[in-house]
């Protein structure tokens, strides 16, 4: 779908054009504004409150119209703190929805929900803006061909492949490598697909947003020396923001991603961390607007809000937006309406395991819990499907045998089971991989492994051709040839020690 970017922001230019109203009521982040008869703003129009508070400080608050209440009154939700606002203050109707800067100038920069840069690097050098509210692409514009989105990470491409233009849920607690995996994907899409990424921080910790920015600069994903060569744009609406900002920041990030897809015709990665906070903010806004709550106190419009965001994330004939969304599961209850509504939209799930992270196997993707709708013979081909299933079966059998090994030891197993365990341990280590963005921590150069190479490697392990190699030869290597070379080096080293 072609976007219709404008070349000016929705701030009204001349005094005659200004549609002025006055604040009638303030309820936290919600404002009621009275306009002259016949001058009512449309739903989703941006309103701007400008003035001074009681101590003379300049106030500039942008709001979004949510309801038309009748009697020339509208109800709007503020995108920033409403401290210092007073009844009777003048409100300007901009006559258009919130619009944000789009295009190459956004790369390497950090924005808030309004598209204003918050990184102290000066204004954004672009006159092209786009409204955050747009309809999803029409059916005729969609690219319905099912194709794999190759990430270069062995465990993902083999066992839970991503769909081009699909939506992936990323599950994992603190410290299991979510951020590093996200940064590696940003790096790989730029190198292998010539694509860019947009990161939407929705309602998460400000410290995490800052850490991510610093780590991206350190790993080269954001190029400080030449900001235009950066591979990602960052949009933050963190925990301290009002619910209106947290509810809309996902749309701001999505709008920037849509421009890269529709106008620049690129493959785009859109990260949303965390999709649950988008629902949570919508729930807060819904209560403030006086709507009757639905199940578990969520907003009655939960499915509609989620659908309007998710349906814009898709492949068109121009390009694709592939979305990776971190999903927080409240109280580990997968039947909670928020995660349950999210699951309906996901094509794949990538589950990060603390047990694997503790073993030092990175990326710590759980091969048995991670799933994908793409892993079907008619989509990925018979060879890929069979290899993935055999890897899972071997890993599952190893998991079942672990209790017996812990109690009786490896010697009590049958010959066949011992062989299964040996191959499963090689597979477990071969699923690890050195990352480009982790070179600064590991000292090992990063590896991008193509899908064909990945399948070949696991087939050789499963067939028994590599049974003679030590399992440590498979740890943190790229393709299977590197594992063979590493085994030879280990053999030489052991002989020298003797």
Swiss-Prot record:
SUPFAM superfamilies: C-terminal domain of alpha and beta subunits of F1 ATP synthase, N-terminal domain of alpha and beta subunits of F1 ATP synthase, P-loop containing nucleoside triphosphate hydrolases
CDD domains reported for this sequence: ATP-synt_F1_beta_C (cd18110), ATP-synt_F1_beta_N (cd18115), F1-ATPase_beta_CD (cd01133)
Recorded catalytic activity of this chain's protein: ATP + H2O + 4 H(+)(in) = ADP + phosphate + 5 H(+)(out)
GO MF, any single term: ATP binding
Record GO cellular component, one term: proton-transporting ATP synthase complex
Binding-site residues, ATP: 172-179
GTP-binding keyword on record: no
InterPro entries with a match to the protein in the record: AAA+_ATPase (IPR003593), ATP-synt_VA_C (IPR055190), ATP_synth_F1_bsu (IPR005722), ATPase_a/bsu_AS (IPR020003), ATPase_alpha/beta_chains (IPR050053), ATPase_F1/V1/A1_a/bsu_N (IPR004100), ATPase_F1/V1/A1_a/bsu_N_sf (IPR036121), ATPase_F1/V1/A1_a/bsu_nucl-bd (IPR000194)
Annotated localization: Plastid, Chloroplast thylakoid membrane
Similarity remark: Belongs to the ATPase alpha/beta chains family.
Assembly behavior: F-type ATPases have 2 components, CF(1) - the catalytic core - and CF(0) - the membrane proton channel. CF(1) has five subunits: alpha(3), beta(3), gamma(1), delta(1), epsilon(1). CF(0) has four main subunits: a(1), b(1), b'(1) and c(9-12).
HAMAP family in UniProt: ATP_synth_beta_bact
Function statement: Produces ATP from ADP in the presence of a proton gradient across the membrane. The catalytic sites are hosted primarily by the beta subunits.
Protein name: ATP synthase subunit beta, chloroplastic
Species the sequence originates in: Caryota mitis
Organism classification: Eukaryota, Viridiplantae, Streptophyta, Embryophyta, Tracheophyta
């Amino acid at each position: 779908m072609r976007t219709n970017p404008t070349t000016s922001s929705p701030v009204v230019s001349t005094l005659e054009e200004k549609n002025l109203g006055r604040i009638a009521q303030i309820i936290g982040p919600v404002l009621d504004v009275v306009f002259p008869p016949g001058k009512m703003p449309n739903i989703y129009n941006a309103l701007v409150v400008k003035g001074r508070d009681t101590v003379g400080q300049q106030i500039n608050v942008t709001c979004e119209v949510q309801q038309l209440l009748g009697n020339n009154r509208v109800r709007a939700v503020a995108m920033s703190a409403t401290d210092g606002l007073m009844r009777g203050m003048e409100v300007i109707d901009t006559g258009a929805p919130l619009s944000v800067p789009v295009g190459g100038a956004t790369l390497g920069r950090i924005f808030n929900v309004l598209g204003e840069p918050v990184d102290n690097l000066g204004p954004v050098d672009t006159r092209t803006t786009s409204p955050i509210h747009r309809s999803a692409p029409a059916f005729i514009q969609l690219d319905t061909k099912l194709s794999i989105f190759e990430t270069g990470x062995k465990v993902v491409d083999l066992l839970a492949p991503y769909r081009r233009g699909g939506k992936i849920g990323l599950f994992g607690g603190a410290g299991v490598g979510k951020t590093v995996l996200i940064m590696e994907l940003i790096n790989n899409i730029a190198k292998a697909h010539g694509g860019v990424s947009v990161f939407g921080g929705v309602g998460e910790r400000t410290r995490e947003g800052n850490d991510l920015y610093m780590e991206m600069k350190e790993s080269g994903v954001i190029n400080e020396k030449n900001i235009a060569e950066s591979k990602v744009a960052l949009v933050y609406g963190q925990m301290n923001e009002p619910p209106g900002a947290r509810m809309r920041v996902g749309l701001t990030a999505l709008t920037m991603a849509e421009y890269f897809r529709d106008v620049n015709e690129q493959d785009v990665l859109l990260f949303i961390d965390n999709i649950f906070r988008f629902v949570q903010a919508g729930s807060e806004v819904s209560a403030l607007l006086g709507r009757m709550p639905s199940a578990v106190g969520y907003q009655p419009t939960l499915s509609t809000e989620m659908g309007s965001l998710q349906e814009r994330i898709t492949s068109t004939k121009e390009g694709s937006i592939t979305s990776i969304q971190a999903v927080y599961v409240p109280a580990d209850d997968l039947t909670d309406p928020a995660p349950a509504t999210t699951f309906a939209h996901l094509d794949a799930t990538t589950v990060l395991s603390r047990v694997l992270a503790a073993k030092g196997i990175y990326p710590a993707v759980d091969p048995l819990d991670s799933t994908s709708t793409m892993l079907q013979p008619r989509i990925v081909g018979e060879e890929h499907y069979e290899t993935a299933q055999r890897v899972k079966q071997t890993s599952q059998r190893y998991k079942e045998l672990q209790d017996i090994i812990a109690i009786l030891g490896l010697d009590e197993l049958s010959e066949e089971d011992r062989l299964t365990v040996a191959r499963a341990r090689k597979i477990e280590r071969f699923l690890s991989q050195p990352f480009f963005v982790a070179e600064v921590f590991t000292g090992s150069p990063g590896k991008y492994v193509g899908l064909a190479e990945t399948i070949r490697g696991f087939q050789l392990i499963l067939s028994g051709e590599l049974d003679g190699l030590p399992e440590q030869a498979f740890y943190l290597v790229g393709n299977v040839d590197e594992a063979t070379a590493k085994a030879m080096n280990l053999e030489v080293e052991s002989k020298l020690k003797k």
